[in-house]
Structure formats: C-alpha cells, structure tokens
Design a protein with these regions (language model features):
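Low-complexity, acidic/polar, glycine-enriched regions of mature
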Residues: 15-196
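Sec-dependent N-terminal signal peptides
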Residues: 3-13
Length: 196
C-alpha cells in the first residue's frame, strides 16, 4: 500500500523515479571537419582547417537544460596547404602556439532558436583572450546506424564569423587587414554517434 501511494504521488507531482542525462555523443572524425576562410588582400578567399580537435557533446533536443558542448582545437594542427604560411600562423605574429596551443569553447547553456536550430552560449578562448561567445548550430538529422544495432548517428553544422583582432590574433604589422582580413568565416561539420 505504501509503495502504491508513493508511486501515485510521484506521477501526480510529475516526477520520474529515474532521471536520465542527455546522451554523451562520440565524434566520428572521418566525417567531421573544422574549417575556416580568410580573405587575402580583401578579395581572395583562402581556406584552411584544423585537423586535430576534440568535441565533448552531451545533447538532447528534449533536455537542453542538461545539454553541454565543449570543443578543444590543437592550433598546431592548422593546415592551409602552405607549409610556410602555416608556420607563420603558429608564430608570435598570430596564434603563438609556443604559449597558447589550444582554442577552446565551453558552453554554459544551450537554447533552441528555431526548428533544429540551437545556440550554445559560453566562452571562447583564443591565445590568452577569453570572451563570451554564442555558437549557433543546426541539427541536420538523426538516424539509426544500419550497420550497428542500437547506435544512433547525428550530424550538426555550424557557421559563424569572428574578428581575429577580438582575440589578438595578429601582432605588429599583422594588425592591419590588408594582407589578412580581420573577419574569419568558420564552418564546423560534425558527425557523432551514441548508443540510445
């Protein structure tokens, strides 16, 4: 009788005896990319990417309050298909990887802003500068993996622009935007999987 009463009260009060956190998703790097584009001489888009990164994602569209996103990028992995330019970008003139080897984003909240559209609000750190940042992203879809029973695959896309000077990426003569524009377009394509 006591168990029946307790169960009834649980239902009436809207509480579930088991509270499940959003799933932890595992990144599939073979289907993920971290890319960026910067204009050269204000006219020519030059594309690059970071090839070493980690994404820690706990996410459920139905439980955004407990969802979180943390990203760590190894700046040493920068690749613009030009070894000399990559070395310069790693130098004190730009990222100064000897002292600041990672770019990090840590969410403090995730909000829905439309159908399958979300914004992760948190802090972005580049070099030794940390600023509040809103990272928009789209849930492209979720499907069951036909080759792995019980495994769900999800895909996300994020496109945004940052001003490199907000993070002091450009010292001395490289503060000017004649050669390398201040505006950097970033595109993230992320595929993850989890056992749901």
């Amino acid at each position: 009788m006591k168990l029946l009463i307790a169960s009834t009260l649980t239902v009436l009060l809207g509480f579930s005896p088991i509270q499940l956190d959003p799933p932890t998703w595992n990144i599939d790097k073979s289907h993920t990319s971290v890319g960026f584009t910067v204009k050269h001489f204000q006219i020519t888009p030059v594309r690059g990417a970071f090839t070493d990164y980690d994404v820690d994602l706990q996410f459920s569209p139905d439980d955004l309050e407990n969802s979180s996103l943390n990203v760590t990028i190894d700046v040493n992995s920068i690749d613009t298909k030009n070894e000399r330019r990559d070395g310069h970008l790693k130098s004190e003139d730009f990222f100064n990887v000897a002292e600041f080897s990672t770019i990090t984003f840590a969410s403090q909240s995730i909000e829905a802003v439309g159908e399958n559209q979300f914004v992760a609000k948190g802090e972005l750190t580049i070099r030794d500068v940390t600023r509040e940042f809103e990272l928009p992203f789209t849930l492209l879809g979720m499907v069951e993996n036909p080759f792995q029973e019980g495994v769900t695959v999800a895909a996300f896309q994020s496109e945004f622009q940052i001003d490199r000077m907000d993070y002091e990426v450009g010292q001395g003569d490289w503060v000017a935007d004649l050669v390398a524009a201040h505006e950097v377009d970033v595109e993230l394509l992320v595929e993850v999987n989890a056992e749901l």
